[in-house]
Amino acid sequence: MHAAEQKLQFPLQQKVMYDSIVIGAGIAGSTVARQLAEKKGHKVLVVEKRDHIGGNCYDRPDDYGILVHEYGPHIFHTNMEDVFMYLSRFTEWILYENGHQVVANVDGRLIPIPFNLNTLHMIYDKETAAALEKKLIGAYGEGSRVPIMKLRENPDPQIQAIAQYVYENVFLKYTMKQWGQTPEEISPEVTGRVPVLISYDNRYFQDKYQGVPKHGFLEMFVRMLDHENITVQTGMDARELLQFRENEILLDGQKFEGNVIFTGALDELYDCRYGRLPYRSLRFEFEHLAQDDFQNGHSVVNYTVSEDFTRITEFKYLTRQKDADGTTIIREYPFAYTGADGEIPYYAIMNPENEALYQKYKKLTQQYSNLYLLGRLAEYKYYNIDAMTKKALELAESLPDCQSQKQLR
């Protein structure tokens, strides 16, 4: 049995042997744990509150044998050669030859998103589209990525008309469903994630590498955590194990001198004493259909002007599964996270007020010289898988070797 599949029980006296404790077994925790164990010689304990590893990337076969992503679709995409090579140690890949492509259902019509020159030619007649294409290239340059809010500022009436179409049919209602806010209220970092592309590129991402692990994300995480120096404990809240006292962290009543890498929700670590950090959560509705296809070969369809859900994912097109019996889809319904049982904080709602609240919690951690915050929950920010992997690798590199490793050199 792989170490990652075990729920281990260990004698109290052995707990003080660990050089590092990693809280959370998602991409952040698993990467830093592997690096500390392998490169720094640390004995690492990974504590995971859920009953499985892999964080929100966790996948599993459903009752019909179709591999599904339990917490919504996750796709690895990157231009970082070092990150791609690192994760390739633990998985082979199904790389998308033509990139990951997404379409929007606009009143029953499917158009490529991000909005690009192909989309332009779909909604305008040939002559008008050619003239508008020339204007867009002249204003922004061929191949550029223009955030919708910036496009709306262009004084040219024809470009404004394009911007208004995109705003109303691609961004506005979808954004309000996803975030519970208008685009004007949302951080530019968020609205800039899906720009208007001045190109004929239908790919949702423009990264060199795009795809999913060949045998699933879970298998990749199992291999990452399968190391003689790593112990994995699932189904445990870290607060059952660690006590945070003034200026020191206790491990079952004894001061812990090693590193604690925390990847969970920072406000919940402190029992939300200043109030909850606002997040958007998601409700997922899985459905299996006794038919070969539901979305005409599209893995993801965004519903930008209709429906209460934001998108539908058809998993067999995401994972390229060939032996699927029927097809399984998932609908996503966003809502405001309240901290109730079963709710999961997915997306930090970034604005100055929420950042100030986060900084209050972060200040509480400064008394612990051996506590490190890592990940989208601990840092209250958005990360793609590649950026999170890179950050975890850098953190591991910055930490010292364990004492026994130093003595061997």
Q: Can you annotate each of these PLM segments?
A:
Residues S20-V46:
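N-terminal Rossmann-like FAD-binding beta1-loop-alpha1 element of flavoenzymes
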Residues G54-N56, V103-N105, I111-I113, W179, ...:
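Short catalytic/ligand-binding loop motif for oxyanion handling, primarily in non-cytosolic enzymes
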Residues K39, E240-L364:
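Mid-domain catalytic core of redox enzymes
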Residues A37-P61:
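Glycine-rich FAD pyrophosphate-binding loop
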Residues R109-L110, P114-G258:
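Active-site/ligand-binding neighborhood in enzyme catalytic cores
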Residues Y64-A139:
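Dinucleotide-binding Rossmann-like beta1-alpha1 core, especially the glycine-rich loop
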Residues I344-R409:
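C-terminal catalytic lobe of FAD-dependent flavoproteins
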Residues M1-S20, E38-G41:
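Extreme N-terminal leader/targeting segments of oxidoreductases
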